[in-house]
Design a protein with these regions (language model features):
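Minor-groove-contacting beta-hairpin "wing" of winged helix-turn-helix DNA-binding domains
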Residues: 324-329
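Extended hydrophobic-aromatic, low-complexity segments
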Residues: 290-291, 303, 320
């Protein structure tokens, strides 16, 4: 941490994850938190999150995490069905997932988030609704529902290419996506980002679920600066993005010799930043902040994409109101396709 230069930056979130930080005892986590707070400037009462794998977290650990300052816990449940966990290769069982959630509440955590995965081969709407029902039954403050993807080089991707199973058809994936939104909205959750839902505290107020939205994740979607520490961690300080070496040994060697363990970095061009701003903005339910876009890029978004926006509005795919341009609910399943339309369009004002 002493090698990282962050002058002028003040943070309000600390996120311990990914990987499996719950393999560490609370004393070790406390050292990380203390070092972070000593090495960087933080606002009062920062959101301090730890990711927990149900297969590595005993109740004593959870109690210890709470005592050392963790105020938000994110549990990688993935599924409440054992066959799904087996398919995904998870080390925890469905019963362990249930136990860790109950333990988190038992030791006093109020801000609990659960991660689920859908779109598994052969998954039915009924089966997915059972997972959603199990999750909402615990009334977590936050739910992240991720579509299963087959990353290159992973065991799942290799099994898929070898024909051991078939990926779920696109039309069935869309049904599950729509089911997610409808079910969670009916049970008191607001979709504030394409995969993220926050519990609404009071009916008729904070309808966007802002109270329980992940403050940390919002940084990624709004071009806020962030610093990543550890192997493979990414950092972004406008307009530069960097990422650390993936090897633990190389990371330690660099740090011990007084060198930043950075594998590479890039300076984003104005056009690259615009493309990311459009894609990330459309991921959020509130959409692209038109005032912020104009301030950052010195062009009017609605003028630059006037014809495309007009066509999308006629198809009820997009809406422009209250200073934002957002995807309509029925268009959120087509995020990638619609985002690409903006990317290939010619800016009237030039890029």
């Amino acid at each position: 941490m002493q090698l990282v230069f962050a002058e002028g930056l003040c943070f309000d979130t600390l996120y311990i994850g990914g990987g499996t930080p719950s393999i560490y005892k609370s004393g070790e986590i406390a050292q990380i938190i203390t070092s972070a707070f000593q090495g960087f400037d933080f606002l009062p009462n920062p959101e301090t999150t730890i990711e927990v794998n149900p297969g590595t977290a005993a109740i004593e650990q959870l109690e210890g995490y709470r005592q050392v300052g963790i105020n938000r816990i994110n549990i990688g449940v993935q599924s409440f069905h054992q066959k799904n966990l087996d398919f995904l290769g998870r080390i925890h069982t469905a019963k362990e997932a249930q136990r860790v959630i109950e333990d988190a509440y038992r030791v006093g955590f109020e801000n609990v988030g659960l991660d689920l995965i859908y779109g598994l081969p052969g998954q039915s709407q009924k089966e997915w609704r059972r997972d959603l029902a199990a999750a909402t039954g615990y009334r977590p403050a936050h739910l992240a529902c991720y579509l299963l993807t087959y990353e290159k080089g992973t065991p799942l991707q290799k099994s898929l290419t070898q024909g051991q199973f078939q990926a779920l058809a696109e039309d069935r994936v869309r049904v599950l996506f729509d089911t997610t939104i409808r079910y969670l909205e009916d049970h008191g959750y607001a979709q504030y980002e394409i995969s993220n839902f926050a519990r609404i505290e009071k009916a008729g107020t904070r309808a966007d679920g802002a109270t329980n939205a992940s403050r940390h994740n919002l940084k990624y979607w709004t071009f806020a600066p962030y610093i990543g520490l550890g192997p493979s961690a990414h950092s972004y300080i406008d307009p530069r993005r960097s990422w650390n070496v993936s090897s633990v040994d190389r990371y330690i060697e660099a740090a011990e010799s007084g060198r930043l363990p950075v594998a590479a970095e890039e300076t984003l061009s104005r056009e690259q930043q615009m493309i990311e701003a459009i894609y990330l903005g459309l991921r959020m339910s509130r959409g692209i902040d038109l005032t912020a876009f104009k301030k950052k890029f010195r062009i009017d978004f609605t003028d630059a994409f006037k014809e495309l926006i007009s066509d999308l509005k006629k198809s009820n795919y997009i809406a422009v109101s209250k200073g934002h341009c957002a995807l309509a609910r029925q268009a959120r399943a087509f995020l990638d396709r619609i985002s690409s339309m903006f990317v290939i369009s010619d800016f009237k004002s030039g890029s």
